Every structure is written in C-alpha cells, then in structure tokens.
Amino acid sequence: YTPILGQLNRLKVNHLTMEFTTPAAGDMAVFKHLREDLEIGLGCVSCDPGQVDSVDEIVARVETALRYLTPARITLNPDCGFAPGSAAKVSLDEVATKLKNEVEASRRLREKYS
C-alpha cells in the first residue's frame, strides 16, 4: 500500500478495506501513515482455497494491526471475498469454517479490548 498512501489519504471516504493475509500487502506499519479519521476494514481471513486461518492466527493478525490503530478504528473482514464464479473455488463448508473462525476471533478480541 505504500506507493498509494497519498491517494488513499485524499479519498473522501471514512472507511478503507485493506487485505492483509498475503505478504504482498506489505507491513501493517503503513497504518501509521493513514489519516486518523479512517476506519480500516482489516482483511484478516484468507479467501484462498484450502487455507483456513485458525482463530489464534486471526487474533494475532488483528493484534498486529492494534499496534498502529485503536480498536474502534478496526472492523474485521475476509480478504477480497468468496466470489462465486471466480477462479478460486472455495467450498461453502470451507467458507463457513473461515467465517466461524472470524466470528470467534472477533468475540475474543472484543472481550479483551472492549
């Protein structure tokens, strides 16, 4: 995201969704350089077939973001999406497991940080 930080900060929006389950996304330290009024939809669950992030992995990913953002600025979401018809075929059972893990991670994080 570093090459487009200037453009992101100029957007007339209150919320950005950013993917962070892939190393290509870069370091979450990028959050230090975003406007403080921006909420971040943190991509914390992989949409790749066969990769089911554990609850602990999701919590750890969010806690990394919390080094740079307050809890109130973060919403959790999967990276990208589970688009039907896309090249990445993810079974509905796998999608359900991924989302259940995200919900449990959210519950744990709320308990700890609310």
For the regions a language model picked out, list residue spans one by one.
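Domain-level signal for soluble alpha/beta catalytic cores
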Residues: 1-114
